[in-house]
Each structure stands twice: as structure tokens, then as C-alpha cells.
Amino acid sequence: MQRQSQSSGLPRNDLLGSYAAQIATGAANSDEMLAPDGSVKPAWASFVAYLRQLSPNELAFRFARGDQYLRDAGVLFRQYDETLSSEREWPLSHIPVIMDESEWQQISAGLIERAELLEFVLRDFYTDNTLVRSGQLPATLLSQNPAWLRPMIGMSRQNNNLLNTVSFEIGRGPSGKWWVISDLIEAPSTAGFAIENRIATSRVFSGFFNSANIHRLAGYFQNFQQTLFDIKGDAEGEVALLSPGLLNEYYPEHTYIARYLGLLLVEGEDLIVQSGKAMVRTVAGAKPISLLWSRLPSPMFDPLEFNPTSMLGA
């Protein structure tokens, strides 16, 4: 069966009509795309103009194409409960969230400042501990917190950041300003899914993506890759990503990120220590690891120093 396209002479769709009416009548408190009077916000104007040229059948076909790409790419999310595990497709929001450059620059500046604060606080907890000694934070915040790893005290006096990656969940508050809903600093995931989402969305709206001045994601990953190899320096050996393994819900992302960044993907059972150096088992014998980027919860990384029941770490 042939699909209908915008070149078939069909009238422009009116999918936004009833939606805009709800906004105009106050049925919704706020909206990213439409102003309270139902007009399209400037950042969305070109996308909405493009969207309205597509028939409902064409939109359905394009949405299905984006979903099919994710299935073909093997983008899955694993779910677990006490008795079984299951896989489900990674949910793709077919309509992207669009914001102008000035709004994103404001958000970005705030998140960078927040990340720098988190880095300062975390480093202080494991070095001088001035926040506790000065009384700004209660001592029990650390001493009774199972996430505080005592063996790490004094080991963070290097120049490298403790937080190599950090993620934030954000949302727009009632006043219209963006709020941070949660800080994700313990092996934050979904960066790989962001790439796949972008690729899928670009296939859904290829005409729009080719003409719009969209901020690219590649720069972030290039900078992060360079950071990892800068930390490695001239040391002999591989840069590896340590994953909990196949049963982890984010394992598909770990494989994608490792391949995208040119890293060796390893699990705890792949690693050994020889003469005080981390090594990875290969068919050609043990090879040195110069830098290990862990995607494990920190207490699970070292069963000798942290959680003795862990079978995931090195």
C-alpha cells in the first residue's frame, strides 16, 4: 500500500487546531509550544509550519519510521522485579522539545554552576572537610550516610574532577522558570539514548532537521572523549568502560557509548590486577588498562574496600 505524502495535494492537517483551542480557553496551565492566547511561540514557528504541511497519514508513517529505527538499532530498556526481567522499547517522544538559543544558554550556565558546586562539595567531603568542620553541615550527614565511602578519604587530591559526568532532571515551574528536579551523579545514564533519540527524530522530520540550525550533540561526546584520553595521558594501555553487565537495564547504552567513544567495554570478571596494575583478560593474554570509567554504583566498584558482596567491580 502506498503512503500519502504532502505532494499528493491533500490539505494541510489541522491537528493543532483543537489543541490550540484548549490552550486559549485555559484548559492547560502552560505549554511549551503555544502561548496562552494560542499563538505559536517564536522558537517553534518554523517547526509548526513544517508540521502543518504533513497529512495525518504522512505523520503516522514518519512516527512509525522513527520507532522502527530504534527497534533496528536494538535500543531497549530492561526492567526487573523480584521474579523476572523484561525488555521494552525505548519510548520515543515523536515531537521534540524546542527552545531558542538564549533560553538554552541560560539553562546551561545554571547547570554548569550547579555541577561546579557539586564537584566542590564532593571534593571537600573527601579532603579538607571544611563544610563539616565549620559547622555549615552536620557531621552525621557524612558519618551516618552509607553513600559516603570512608576508604576514599584523602584520595581525591588530584587535579582531575571527581564528577566526570553529571546529569540533571529539569522541568518548567509555575512561574515559567526552569527548575532542577533532581541531581544524578552516581553513574548517570541516558546520554547514549539521547544520541539515538536525536537520530530517530532526525529521520522522522528529516526535511526540518536539514534546514534548521539545531545544536549538535557530537561536540559533547568529542569533548568528553578528549577528557578521558587527556586523563590517560601517555600511559600504555586501554581506556575502558566498566559495565555491570548484560543484565543491567542500561547495558544497551553502555555498549553504544563504548563503541561511539572508542572505549573497551569490560565487566568485573574481565579484570585482574598484576603487580598493582589493572589488566584485562584477552585471548592474547592480559593487557594493561590505563583508565577505567566505571558505570557502577560506587559501593559496588571494589569488594575489598566497599561492599564485600559485590561481584560486579574490579
Predicted feature locations:
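Preference for protein termini
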Residues: 1-314
